């Protein structure tokens, strides 16, 4: 038994397949830079925190790690959340892939007081509870728009902040 597919449905399927192939080709040609959780004890850690650990902190950590690597900085960024989501939205993964990046972690991870204490710096998009941050100094970036509504504006605001941060850091000698 064969199901008839309308002309409009065939066109939509072809368009979807074409876009998927174009995205795959772009990733292959450009390459996807991966930045995972720090595995070296020799690197200082910067922590980016957003409420759910799934969007802004992921974007900031991924872009920070790219910039730090390009500039030879002995620092790695991680993404953390307060009330973490179960997963990173597909739209954010796709937009990061379009930037040649992947999220800083596979799934959102909650910030612990130990991580806050060990971080050389914490940047947050949302309030970090006092019992988690302890004595750690937190710099808040409240001017970043919602990335799920306007990824480009959010990314550009984050990257502007990151440029200011990395300019103050010394490159690895």
Residue ranges of model-derived segments:
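Conserved active-site segments centered on acidic
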Residues: 37-111
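Conserved acidic residues
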Residues: 120-122
């Amino acid at each position: 038994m064969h199901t008839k597919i309308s002309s409009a449905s065939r066109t939509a399927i072809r368009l979807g397949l074409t876009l998927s192939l174009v995205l795959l080709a772009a990733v292959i040609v450009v390459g996807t830079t991966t930045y995972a959780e720090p595995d070296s004890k020799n690197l200082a850690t910067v922590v980016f925190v957003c409420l759910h650990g799934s969007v802004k902190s992921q974007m900031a950590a991924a872009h920070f790690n790219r910039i730090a690597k390009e500039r030879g900085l002995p620092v790695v960024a991680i993404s953390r959340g307060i009330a973490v989501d179960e997963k990173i939205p597909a739209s954010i993964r796709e937009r990061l892939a379009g930037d040649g990046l992947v999220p800083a972690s596979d799934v959102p991870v909650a910030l612990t007081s130990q991580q806050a204490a060990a971080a050389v710096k914490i940047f947050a998009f949302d309030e970090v509870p006092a019992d988690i941050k302890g004595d750690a100094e937190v710099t808040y970036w409240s001017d970043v728009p919602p990335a799920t509504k306007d990824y480009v504006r959010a990314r550009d605001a984050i990257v502007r902040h990151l440029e200011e941060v990395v300019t103050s850091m010394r490159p690895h000698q």
